[in-house]
Amino acid sequence: MLHNDDVIAYPTESMFGLGCDPNSKKAVKKLLNLKNRSIEKGLILVASDFDQIKMYVNENILSNKQKKKIFFHWPGPFTFLLPAKPNTPYWLTGKFNTVAVRVSAHFEIIKLCNAFGQAVVSTSANISNMTPCFTSEEVFKCFGKDFPLLNGKIGNEKNPSKIINIINGKLIRYV
């Protein structure tokens, strides 16, 4: 489905997420329209390992200390804002020069990314500013009974991933 520019719902560490092929402008536009979300905000990419996100990240800008901090927290529920490569699509970075990426330890995300063969866009399964979906029933209620859904269990995290800007060290989201 992801290879066909579709958007799917899938379990993440803390809730259901919506995902699509990050390299497909058509798929990302579908996702943004579903959520009523601005392209300016940028999107998070989840991956099963760092190799799946390397094509988006300008590693040359990162210091050894920054790299150590990132890999200390990965895999895990930490999203980092990393310097984006110049060719990273604007629909992923939004109005920023960074890309938000997470190497997950959650089995369902690892399985999804490995089956797809690359990173996947990850955003909460909800309409922007509404309550996220925690069950498949809530996903179907929000997006329709035929919405593509990867069955599985959400993880044990109580909150969305923490977001850390590795460039300036600021914590963007801590809940």
From Swiss-Prot:
Keywords: ATP-binding, Cytoplasm, Nucleotide-binding, Nucleotidyltransferase, Transferase, tRNA processing. One of its GO terms (biological process) is tRNA threonylcarbamoyladenosine modification. The keyword Nucleotide-binding applies. It is an enzyme of class 2 (transferase). It comes from the Bacteria. Its EC number is 2.7.7.87. The keyword Nucleotide-binding applies. It catalyses: L-threonine + hydrogencarbonate + ATP = L-threonylcarbamoyladenylate + diphosphate + H2O. InterPro entries: DHBP_synth_RibB-like_a/b_dom (IPR017945), Sua5-like_dom (IPR006070), TC-AMP_synthase (IPR023535), TC-AMP_synthase_SUA5 (IPR050156). This is Threonylcarbamoyl-AMP synthase. Required for the formation of a threonylcarbamoyl group on adenosine at position 37 (t(6)A37) in tRNAs that read codons beginning with adenine. Catalyzes the conversion of L-threonine, HCO(3)(-)/CO(2) and ATP to give threonylcarbamoyl-AMP (TC-AMP) as the acyladenylate intermediate, with the release of diphosphate. Belongs to the SUA5 family. TsaC subfamily. GO terms for molecular function: ATP binding; double-stranded RNA binding; L-threonylcarbamoyladenylate synthase; tRNA binding. Its main location: cytoplasm. Residues 1-175 form the YrdC-like domain. One of its GO terms (cellular component) is cytoplasm. HAMAP family: TsaC. It is found in: Cytoplasm. PANTHER family: SUA5, THREONYLCARBAMOYL-AMP SYNTHASE. The gene is tsaC.
